[in-house]
Design a protein with these regions (language model features):
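Short beta-strand scaffold positions
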Residues: 119-120
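Alpha-helix capping/helix-boundary segments
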Residues: 123-125
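Short, compositionally biased "basic patch" segments
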Residues: 1-4, 76-78
Length: 210
């Protein structure tokens, strides 16, 4: 019996192929280094995607609902851009308000020594390494901390509401897993990553105004 793959579940045919390639590289150990996280050192989580208008702001918003201090950036974005309308709508339907979000371009100077940097695709790792980022707590792929492992989370920008919901649903699972790991390494749960909330807000404002 033939196995039918719903490629839209991954964001389309090209996205599915990117997913397969990332899975193979992960299985070969190419991303073993991104599992070396100092969880007890984490004081803030920096989510990084491509444009900082869909995935990373949603992840940041969801993380803050868990009491996690979080900030988000884009590898290629225009500082001050609002969240994508489709992201805004689909996030709102899931209880995350992105109406006040303004995009900020990623720069290593904005990463603090105790930040955990979480990205959505292997190509984001390439750019972060190119910039010489040294995040004390670690740099990792958001989708490798649950099963099945998903080293590549396709950008929902320009795609259907169905895929937006699929993507955001997966991010919810990743943030749940993140919250549990942080709670295991900090007592009381989440306290250690909530202390720099004002610093996060200040960093966002400064990044958006540059």
């Amino acid at each position: 019996m033939a196995i039918i793959i719903d490629v839209e579940h991954y964001g389309g045919r090209r996205a599915y192929l990117a997913h397969l390639r990332a899975r193979v590289l992960y299985a070969m150990g190419s991303y073993d280094w991104v599992r070396q996280i100092q969880w007890s050192a984490v004081r803030r989580v920096a989510f990084v995607c491509q444009g900082n208008i869909c995935r990373s702001p949603y992840a940041g918003g969801r993380a803050r609902l868990h009491g996690i201090s979080a900030i988000s950036f884009g590898i290629q974005t225009v500082d001050g851009s609002a969240a994508d309308p489709a992201a805004l709508r689909n996030a709102f339907n899931r209880g995350v308000d992105l109406s006040g979000h303004r995009a900020a371009r990623f720069d290593k100077s904005l990463i603090a020594p105790n930040d955990l940097v979480m990205v959505f695709e292997p190509r984001h790792l390439v750019e972060i390494v190119r910039q010489g980022v040294t995040a004390g707590a670690g740099i990792t792929l958001i989708g490798i901390w649950t099963k099945p492992r998903r080293p590549h989370i396709q950008d929902p920008y320009g795609r259907s509401d169905r895929y937006f919901q699929q993507c955001f649903s997966e991010i919810d699972l990743y943030i749940d897993a993140l919250a549990k790991r942080l709670a295991e390494h900090h007592a009381p749960a989440g306290a250690a990553v909530m202390g720099c909330h004002s610093e996060v807000t200040s960093s966002l404002k400064n990044a958006s105004s540059e």
